[in-house]
Amino acid sequence: MHMNRREFLQLLAVAAASGMALDSKSALAGKAPATFYDVPRHGNVSFLHFTDCHAQLTPVWFREPNVNLGVGGSYGKAPHLVGQHLLKQFGIKPGSAEAHAFTYLDFTEAARVYGKVGGFAHLKTLVDKMRAQRPGALLLDGGDTWQGSATSLWTNAQDMVDACIALGVNVMTSHWEAMFGADRMMEIINNDFKKTGMDFVAQNVVTNDFGDQVFKPYVMKEMNGVKVAILGQAFPYTPIANPRYHVPDWSFGIRDDSMQKWVDEARAKGAEAVILLSHNGMDVDLKLATRVTGIDAIFGGHTHDGVPQPVNVKNAKGITLVTNAGSNGKFLGVMDFDVRGGKVQSYKYRLLPVFSNLLPADPAMDAYIKKVRAPYEAKLSEKLAITDDFLYRRGNFNGTWDQLIVDALMEVKGADAAFSPGFRWG
């Protein structure tokens, strides 16, 4: 992609207007401190959360959006904050490691310092570090995990299933998992998960004929003498956003009434902390938190929002914390509760970026990833093209990756217009 002088000057003007630093060295403060991943334990109940990794076993380059407009009352509020506005809202120092993780600012220069993000071998190292400090901590997978890479397609999701087992996932919900088909989903849940004690929860998926629960709506666990309940919420619009023929006998939806029923039941059974593992998307979770009471925290996904701190949402009986943990294995949420007297007294939360340059790869996970990818290495390493421009795919309206796709469609097909639907989330 080549630019003439006028286009280059226009790009500079856009960059300046959007707050993009043209001198990256002026804004990049330096590497993260050695204590970056030191997160002292708080309280007696801990949850670790990742979501929407989209089958990315290896580290990736990932730039956060420079445009993320909220609609109506959501305008100018989390998760619809980018760049300097996000830094100001959450008190993050410009040029810091967190600034690189949560914003697009100085992306190219900072990426050279911190490296790629995510990768299950690096995520495994971080998960193990957090668990070593938090006896009994539960690892939650928010879904969109099995789908999104060539190897997940070629192995019928088995590469990701085995990786999640090795990672130590305790509880999972779903969205794109359904695209492997209902039979394959049930095969994995009833065999692979059952053998390892992993739970799959989704309170909002029922049969079309009699409305019976397809999956467990929630599970009860005990952590350091404290009973906790984890409810599941699969993506409510799966048969609309994805081909219905993959799950022809299942009905989805938000189903906040049934969710309230399950929350109340879990509380009646002695749950002192109740959390929701959700794939609604953050805006839906924020609304849901006003309607359903008794949930201490929502660990959200789907919209790929890396939000540094929870949003406190008031409802008729208290407050629910709403979080969202980004995508592509880039973040690990760490929520610590102090539970006493039958309820959550206080909490501390960190959304930790998984920087491949700062976290060593776990040897066993690294070996597994190399092994599972080895049969396909020739295909995976094939060079398709070389770009002379910066390609990214995050923003409400467009990105350079989307532009490349639609330009190609118009050139090859001779079309007057072309559209790229939703690629920004991938």
Show the residue positions of the predicted features:
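Acidic, metal/ion-coordinating pockets
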Residues: 3-13, 19-356, 364, 396-408
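Generic surface-pattern signal
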Residues: 17, 91-92, 132, 194, ...
